[in-house]
Amino acid sequence: MTEMMTPAMRQYYEAKQAYPDTLIFFRMGDFYESFGEDAKTIAKELEITLTARGKDRSGERMPLAGIPYHAIDTYLPRLINKGYKVAICEQLEDPKQAKGVVKRGVVRVVTPGTAIDSSMFPDASNNYLMAVAGKEVGKTGKSGEKEMEFGLSFLDISTGEFLTTQFTDSGSFDKLLSELARMKPAECILPPTLYGNSVLVDRLREQTIVQEFAPEISGIEEAGEKLKIHFRVSTLEGMGCEKLEFGVYSAWSALEYAKTTQMRDLAHINTLRTYSNTEFMVLDSVTLRNLEIVKNVRDEGDHNSLYRTLSFTKTPMGSRILKKWLLKPLLSVEQINHRLDAVEELAGNPLLRYDIRDWLSEVRDIERLVGRIVYGNANARDLVALKKSLDAVPSIRDCLLEKAGAEMLKGIAEGLASFSEIEELAKMIGNAIVEEPPVSVREGGMIKSGFSEELDELRDISSNSKQWIAAFQQKEKDRTGIKSLKIGYNKVFGYYIEVTNANSSQVPDDYIRKQTMANAERFFTPELKEKESLILTANDKAVALEYEIFTEITETLSAHSKELQETAERIGVLDVLADLAEVAENNNYTRPQLTEDCKILIRDGRHPVVESTVSGGFVPNDTEMDCKENQFLLVTGPNMAGKSTYMRQTALIAIMAQAGSFVPASYASIGVIDQVFTRIGAFDDLASGQSTFMVEMVELANILNNASPKSLVLLDEIGRGTSTYDGYSIAKAVVEFLHNRGKVGIRALFATHYHQLTSLEEKLKRVKNYHIAVKEEGHELVFLRKIVPGATDRSYGIHVARLAGVPEKVIERANEILRELERESVLEESEDCENGKKRKGKATTRYTQMLLFDPGSRSGNSEVKRGLSPVEAALKKMNVDEMTPIEAMNKLHELKKLLG
């Protein structure tokens, strides 16, 4: 049936055959069109009209959907963000000049991980393509999956950033998932050997889009050779990945995939950085969620996250780098102090900080501007934005060279100074491009007058052709002396010089006869012929020349892409340092001390996010942890009193400190933490068929299997999703395990309502009890938000229920039930004591199963005592030492009557 198709439809099917798993955007004049099943998909996803045109292979009417070519930046991101791949099939020649059907071809394939248009992702986020390589090593890991050796690479083609790492030790599967959570790639590619691993693919697909991709190489050795060719180096040792076999393989996979989709060399990807998970604090996906590092739990936006609380950066590069620093806090005390030195200097010098941030506000997204320039997707407005950005750099550089003292600031200044051509490039753009150019680079109007004599002449000809013809006619009259000479034009002969027969003897020798008429002859000269061509094509030539000039400028800029990217990174780092200094000064943060020991000492610590959102001030609290007496802090207290906030703020202060930020405290000393683990909140994983309790246990297993003596563990209510006996048993076992792990145990904060756990302080030497103080005022409960030593025996659940708006009838009934349970507990305890042994009756079992502690207990450790029952009040007034046996018996009968 192909003979029934038009030539254009045959082109479409050829493109579809080459890219069967990809939607085709097929350029037809002023539209991108799609046909068949692609059209149905596009119409549905973009909510546009589905029509029909022509016939398909079977002779049926062909479904059609199309969008205007100028609206592609609006529609394309919607498809990419839904996980589709889109092949852009462009017209490869001017339809006006085409002989026959217009040549068309796929010029790039846009996938989630290879998008370069800024409309497809936020300025503050990287758009990573992740490539994974590896193999099974046979044994089963702690989490139940097969142990693997993995190489991971992350490539952001919009900025040129390229990273690789490798995990060959135990727990590599969990480390892979942690990197996935931190880097948040838009797309992940796997070789066929790993794509067949359903466990791996399913876990990856929980967080990103997964594609199968087989690079066209024979193996790891060829991958290394291909990378050397791309980077124009003889060895990969300088990049630190020479011995990372799977890292190298994954790196080439990512690069080949990007080259295949973009159909160009990607020269701006000019270096590969190797990193190790031993360089950074590990924050897995659970911890990132629970601590709301870059996204909040409520709607996964960035408001009310740590990142948004600290992010007042001036540049997109700075926003992205700040996010990276928070996701990857450092482990090296020396490197952390380099950052802190720079922040301290900028915080202490407000004039320097103000000037730098003022200049930074002029800087646009240099990284992505350079990426678009190298890709050939930039327009003249991008060049103007780059020029304005480069104009600010010399002022920043000179200011730092003159005033900066911190090593990191001086390094930035020296790096900026090493790019000596920066002013020249800015000047080149400024001389050539108008200040407010049009969006299109194919329609002219972007090059300044005076930049090119040829362009000025073409423009002059195009706009002043009549004046030029009149001037030429007068010039020829004066030269020949023929007063009747005139210049004419027709579509057949073009421009000509007409001389009457009476003046034919005066015709100069350089006139060339074009046409003989009855009363006159028509001539042309080489100059007129040249001008005729210019006049007739002046506008087209002017537009073409403007594009040629624009292309020459972009090629010059592309040749400096590496230096421009390095400049962008230095500017971004400076932006983060200045931002952290600004936040520190505005919020009264202090410089933390970092140590190699296991101590954590925080005075007047505050939760950075909560502090920024609450009115009336935040109640600060101290934290003291070490490996001797304060390794495990057991925190009790009512719901809503602030236990979770207290635990989270401790972790956030440590993360901020190791990221290089000042912290919300009057004093902070942090023994470097290698991992932060959290078990907070209750979530069902319905998609995986996991209950709340199962999710809790999976997270707990990860903590117990992977936490080290340098880790920090936050546990909030272990065992809530099961029976009280089971929950308490698990919670107690966890405390003992973490306390006794290794020689010094693992630093942990554990918030619990299992008040019997507080007795562990007497049995385990490094467990310390703390509680959140509250105050009862009549029926009201006041949360003091202050953490104080000792345990509490009350949860104040009914008080909290009242605060939550539970109907008063329910509250009253709950109090009645509570008093009944307390009365049963007193009676059971009395009988137990009388029998001299523990009772195993139904009432005791039922009550203990619910509460696990004596609600009438008076341990003396609680700061706030609840209201006394009548029996308790009577007992409290008794002076047993002064009572006779008969009086005691009578009082006992009275108490029994009170109990009913």
From Swiss-Prot:
Domain of life: Archaea
GO biological process assignments: mismatch repair
UniProt keyword DNA-binding present: yes
Residues binding ATP, per UniProt: G637, P638, N639, M640, A641, G642, K643, S644
Claim: DNA damage is one of the keywords in the record: yes
Gene Ontology molecular function, alphabetical: ATP binding; ATP-dependent DNA damage sensor activity; damaged DNA binding; mismatched DNA binding
Pfam families, sorted: MutS_I, MutS_II, MutS_III, MutS_IV, MutS_V
Coiled-coil annotated spans: none
InterPro entries (UniProt xref): DNA_mismatch_repair_MutS (IPR005748), DNA_mismatch_repair_MutS-lik_N (IPR007695), DNA_mismatch_repair_MutS/MSH (IPR017261), DNA_mismatch_repair_MutS_C (IPR000432), DNA_mismatch_repair_MutS_clamp (IPR007861), DNA_mismatch_repair_MutS_core (IPR007696), DNA_mismatch_repair_MutS_N (IPR016151), DNA_mismatch_repair_MutS_sf (IPR036187)
SMART domains, sorted: MUTSac, MUTSd
UniProt keyword terms in alphabetical order: ATP-binding, DNA damage, DNA repair, DNA-binding, Nucleotide-binding
Its biological purpose: This protein is involved in the repair of mismatches in DNA. It is possible that it carries out the mismatch recognition step. This protein has a weak ATPase activity.
Family statement drawn from the similarity comment of this UniProt entry: Belongs to the DNA mismatch repair MutS family.
Name of this chain's protein: DNA mismatch repair protein MutS
Organism lineage string: Archaea, Methanobacteriati, Methanobacteriota, Stenosarchaea group, Methanomicrobia
Gene that specifies this protein: mutS
